[in-house]
Regions:
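Conserved phosphate-binding/catalytic loops in two-lobed NTP-binding clefts
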Residues: 157-164
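Metal-dependent phosphodiesterase/nuclease catalytic metal-binding core
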Residues: 1-135, 142-149, 154, 170-202
Length: 202
């Protein structure tokens, strides 16, 4: 968890949640060529541990794993005007949660109150090269649609979550982050969780 300064007129911070890097992909062909048997030895190598084979040969993870893969990164900017500190903190993030209190026609009001417009939030997301922008803290004068449309002219992969929506932060190889409508993620998890011993009753 990495805090960073946010421009809001008073002392304010945002947070970057940064996951540790993951081991590289397991190279099955390399493991086969080295004589690593299927089973716990391969699991240990995938966890980054060296193993010793029955013939005395020691296999280190770098012999069977590809380059390390980055973990996921979610940045919550909180209230504030667009700033370089947010761009730097959000660089390459999977998800940036950024306020969009106003639309661009209220930019002067946004400056007075040290908030952001949807257009500005989208500019931050584009500059930081994030994967998904989630807009929050909308003024009650908006219903969300116009805010999303304004942001998408700058950064197409923008969502405006509603109460009980969830953002499923998937790894890039599994499709990347996605907005899941209220409760759908929990319902899917419940469907997939079959209690032990009930399989034969269905």
């Amino acid at each position: 968890l990495v805090p960073f300064a946010v421009a809001h007129g008073v002392s304010a911070v945002g947070y970057a949640l940064v996951e540790d890097a993951r081991p590289g992909r397991f190279d099955v062909q390399a493991a086969d060529a080295l004589g690593v048997p299927e089973g716990p030895e391969r699991g240990a190598l995938q966890r980054g541990e060296s193993v010793t084979l029955p013939d005395g040969q020691t296999i280190t993870p770098d012999k069977v794993l590809g380059a390390a893969r980055s973990g996921r990164k979610v940045v919550i900017a909180g209230d504030g005007s667009p700033s370089e500190s947010v761009i730097e903190a959000a660089r390459g993030a999977d998800v940036l949660v950024h306020e969009a209190t106003f639309c661009e026609d209220e930019r002067d009001r946004a400056r007075e109150t040290q908030h952001s417009t949807a257009h500005e939030a989208a500019g931050v997301a584009r500059a930081a090269e994030v994967e998904l922008l989630a807009l929050t803290h909308l003024s009650n004068r908006y219903f969300g649609g116009e805010v999303a449309r304004e942001a998408r002219t700058i950064f197409p992969n923008t969502v405006v979550p509603k109460d009980f929506d969830t953002i499923d932060v998937r790894f890039q190889e599994r499709g990347g982050p996605q907005l899941v409508k209220g409760g759908a993620l929990e319902r899917r998890a419940e469907r997939e969780a079959v209690p032990s011993g009930e399989e034969g009753q269905k």
